[in-house]
Amino acid sequence: MEFNRHTLLVLWGLPASGKSTYVEKHGLTDLCVSYDQIRDIIGGKHYAFRYGKLVIDPDVERAAHQMSLYAISCRMRTGDFIVYDNTNTLPQDVLNQEMRWLKDLCDIHDYTLWYKRFDTDVETCLKRSKERSKYEPTEEVMRQQEMYFRNAQMPSFVRNFDYSGYDGLLQKKED
């Protein structure tokens, strides 16, 4: 497949909502910056669940966030299509700030910022989460993220991939 250059596609949805599956299914793995993978490199695989309960280390999260933005910035220097695989289930003010950082990077590197929303219901996400690993968010954490996700709106400067009518983002390469 051939992808439009100078495009950043942000995936947005609950854990286990299908974001990483979408990346794999559409052959986007090599074009993806995955927050989870970067966090696992820094903190170790499943670092937050080492003691049988969810314990988030703010230093690991901060470093993973900074490294994700740095990786995106470095990839933008090549002009390549980029997918950012991150839940982005955040309170509205934090989501706005996160998208503003990405928008600023896009402006610097002449990129267009898109998002794809994954509206998978929380019960399905909880079921998938339990099936794939014991190291997944608890129901309480997932429901908190759902509340943020359902009540948040992407800032207007981020284009909606699903409702844009723009089907040229992912183009089949002509032989």
Spans of features found by a protein language model:
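Short His-Asn-centered micro-motif
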Residues: 12-14, 35, 84-87
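Conserved nucleotide-binding/hydrolysis micro-motifs of P-loop NTPases
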Residues: 37-39, 89, 119-124
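Conserved GTP-binding G-domain of TRAFAC-class P-loop NTPases and closely related GTPase folds
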Residues: 2-12, 17-20, 29-31, 108-109, ...
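Short glycine-/acidic-enriched loop or helix-start segments at secondary-structure transitions
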Residues: 44, 93-95, 127
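Short, glycine/charged-enriched secondary-structure capping and boundary segments
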Residues: 25-27, 47-48, 97-104, 129-132
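Conserved substrate/cofactor phosphate-moiety recognition/catalytic segment
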Residues: 20-80
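Glycine-rich phosphate-binding loop used to anchor ATP phosphates in small-molecule kinases
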Residues: 58-114
